[in-house]
Amino acid sequence: MVNVRRTIRTGACAVVVAALLATAGAAHAAKPIGKRIVLDNGMVLLLAEKRDLPVVTVSMAIKAGSMVEPADKPGLASLTASLLMQGTARRNATQISNEIDFVGGSLSVSGGSDFASAGLRVLKKDLRLGLDLLSDVLRNPVFDQKEIDRKVRETLAGIQSQKDEPGVVADDAFTRAVFGSHPYGRTNDDVAAYLPRLKKRDLAEFHGAFYGPDTAIIAVVGDVSEQEIVHLLQEYFKGWKRAPRPAPSIAPMPARERRDVIAIEKDITQANIVLGHIGISREDPDYYAVLVMNYILGGGGFSSRLMDNIRDNRGLAYSVYSSFSAQKEPGAFSAEVQTKNESANEAIAEILKELGRIRTEPVTDRELADAKAYITGKFPLRMDTSAKIAGILTAVEIYNLGLDYPQKYPALINAVTKEDILRVAKRHLHPDRVVIVVVADQAKAKVH
């Protein structure tokens, strides 16, 4: 089932960027992945010509995520994005859907934490239609109040359907505790409390303030030349006014000086445990070493230390993992596990022990080599479609990685040493300052 909070907060763009950049490697050719062009209206175009099929894929990131929505209007950015396809000054929602379906294409818009995202895929012969539709939904939404009310009801129903899911309850409590009043800390409950008060004016004002060519990155991959795509984008996005982008008031992330336990009562047989703290941003120089370190700790599936200890040696859980959510601002470091209520304390203790061990003991040569081989070896699967290439292009621009990023990546990973692992583990893992959320039958879990 979809996690509504994650859909609202992180959206498609963030999920694609994190997945692609976490494992990108070296391209076979030594040339840059694409070309960067700034259009007359300020829009940044990244183009990768790919002539093997008569198809064009477009990925857009617009600086209109929940980071810039007013603090007292959680969910506004995501709702605005979700309404763009529901009617424009030229087309209603049915017409938009029918026109793209008729040519066998796809068109989508969604909200996220740092960015809103849009995607388009059409045959080369239908590129004009596709760009006409894309520019129309981005530039000319009408935000019909009936559509707003329908989308609000739909979102609230989704939140309500998940309200009793232990994993969602734990995730929301963890997010709120770690990020506080920062935009990354907004939860299902925050969104549900505000959405019913939304009006057309709220969406129109947000759209007018943050949607514009100067806030947009557009990646194009496929059977189209630079001259052709520049001409088409100039044509279909001509007259799109630059966004004023008022500076949002963003609450700082809270500092944490101690370990906190949040015990939530629920009549269930399995305790749902999430523990962690604020992690790193994607642009942190330690990103690559942290990526390798976390693979060894808990990101490497069945080969990770957490899995070896908690699943294989102790039989406490089927799965346990850790992750760093690296975004424009520091995301969360978290470790998650489900175990019997009675073994909750043991599972927590073992996770904390592994956090301490990787901070104090060098990893083995084998662990380091295996992590590097896996991370760099995943590259072919991360650039095997035009959509994935477009996602990487967008990420390259967002995080200032350079168009030669795929060529540099293996060296960046392979340069990580055991000393680097120890250094970044000490810097970015803090077992004495974690938030520990336990959703369980507390009489049996006896969390302390």
Locate predicted features.
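Boundary at the C-terminal end of the N-terminal hydrophobic targeting segment
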Residues: 24-29
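Mature N-terminal segment immediately following signal peptide/propeptide cleavage
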Residues: 30-61
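His/Glu-based metal-binding/catalytic segments typifying zinc-dependent metallopeptidases
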Residues: 50, 59-61, 245-303
